[in-house]
Structure formats: structure tokens, C-alpha cells
Amino acid sequence: MKTPAERIRLLLLMSIAMPVAWATWSALLNNFVVEKAAFTGAEIGILQSLREVPGFLAFTAVFVLFVLREQTFAIVSLAVLGLGVALTGLFPTEYGLYFTAVLMSIGFHYFETMKQSLSLQWLHRDEAPQLLGRMIAAGALTSLLVYATLWLLFEWMSIDYVWVYLLAGGVCLGMAVYMRLSFPVFSSDSTQTMELFLRRRYWLYYALTFFSGARRQIFVVFAGFMMVEKFGYSVSQIALLYLINHVFNYLFAERIGALIGRIGERRALIIEYVGLIVVFTGYAFVNEATLAAVLYVIDHLFFALALSLIHI
């Protein structure tokens, strides 16, 4: 049995719209807050902590579903994400950035929760792996195009942050409006259970997920901010670094998956965490910009390894 084409098209559009806004926001953030709001490590830490609050509260999505259908909720969340990104450049102050980051994060985390749920419900089991791979590829290609565009805009045109945030957020918001107006509300082939489940036997998975989240914040928050504040990386250089990361991920992701299949999850985890000890120790003592960039790329490869382990 085949998945209806309209459902696939909607999921693909969602997979494209989200990284237009998210990739722009994340790539520009560190340079923007340092140049326009004079952020230090303390302020960026507060901003990123506030940004994670909606992620922690993503379980509250089950309560919203008593009021909104999942498809509608996903599109509304995508629109909120786009709005938060569009407003970011207009509020270059400490509290303004806190507000827009939280607004963006609310849309992002609710959207990701709903999109994953819709994908599992709409895609037929025999087609799901291929179609999920297609959606991941669409999102990755969109991110690559965004980073390449950012590099061109800031390297050759010196465009202002405000217009880039407005453009990226506006595109995401516009795509959300298009999805709402152009697609019917699809029915689900499965019944959605409005409950949360925790199982004691999964405690190790919960613990590893917790530590993985903490490690991810070091990569997302500290490492990128260090590249800007300590080594003076420009927006175009950061965009280029993100571009390199995604190219490396594209080239090595399949090999990483094959490696895990050969050596097993246990050894893969040992390799990941030993490697991270070396990388984070390097972050503490590195004083050369190129070496810091190399550590950043290696860090991203270990992050790809962690993602592969999570999805096994």
C-alpha cells in the first residue's frame, strides 16, 4: 500500500521550510549577539538556557492536541518558528534576543514533535525508511543551500542582519501559510494515544539521552560562540564552517553507520566519548583559529556518530 502523494508532498515541504529559518538563525546568532548586543559567555548561556525551556516542555504538546489537530498544530508551530526568526534582527538587545529566541524555540520544538508524529502515522511501514531518508536529504540540502547563500551574502554583499533574518523567517512563515491554505486536513490511519510513557527498563537510554543533550549544548552553545568571541570568525567564515560540517556529514554519515554495524553500539559509544574528551580538552587550550576549526569539524563528526547511535 502506497502513501498518498499529497501527504508526502506536505511532509517534504515541512522538511524544507524548517531549516530555512533554523539554519539561518543558528548560523548568524553568535556573530549577531556579539556585534549588536555585546554578549559575553554569560548572556549567551542565559539565552541558550531559555531557548531549551520549550524543548523541556515539549511534552505539553499532548495537551494542545485536545484543541488542535496535529497537522494544524505542526503548521502553526512552523509559522511561530518563522515569526521568531523574522523578528530576531529587529530586537538587537539582551531581553529582545531572549524573547525572540524563546518564541523561535517554541515553534521549533513543537513543530519537530508534531512532524515526527505525523511521519510515523502517515507513512506506510514498507515505504517509511525510504521516505524518511528523502525528507532528511531534503532538509540537509536546504541547510547546505542556506549556508552557501549566507556565505555569499556576507562575503560579497555585506548585507545587514535585519534583512537576512526577515527574509529567512518570512520564507518559513510564508511556506506555513501556503501549507495551511493548499492542503486539506488529512485523516490518520492510526489512533493517536494522548499519554506519556516512561519505562524503568529504558533507564540507560534515558541517561544516555540526558548526557547527549548536555554534550550537544557544549557543541551548539560554547564551541560556536568561542569561534566568534575568541578567534574573531566573521559571519561568512562561520557559514563556511557550517557548510564544511554538512559536507563532511554527507560524505561520512553512511560510513559511520557501517562502522557502528561492525563494531557494535558499546564500542562506538566508547570511541565517541573518548574522542569528545580529547576534543573538549583541545577547546580548553587551543589558541590557533585553524586548529579550533578542525576541532569543531571533528566535534561535528562525533555528533553525527551520536545521532546514528540514537536512531539504531
Where are the regions that the model predicts?
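Glycine-rich segments within core transmembrane alpha-helices of 12-TM secondary carriers
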Residues: 132-148
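Short amphipathic helix-loop junctions that connect adjacent transmembrane helices
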Residues: 27-43, 221-238
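C-terminal membrane-cytosol helix-exit motif in multi-pass small-molecule transporters
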Residues: 150, 169-188
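Conserved small/polar residues in nucleotide/adenosyl-binding loops
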Residues: 310-312
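Helix-loop junctions at membrane interfaces in 12-TM secondary transporters
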Residues: 89-100, 284-296
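Helix-to-loop junctions at the C-terminal end of transmembrane segments
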Residues: 58-70, 154, 252-265
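Structural signature of the two symmetry-related core transmembrane helices
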Residues: 73-86, 267-282
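Cytoplasmic helix-loop-helix junction between adjacent transmembrane helices
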Residues: 106-137
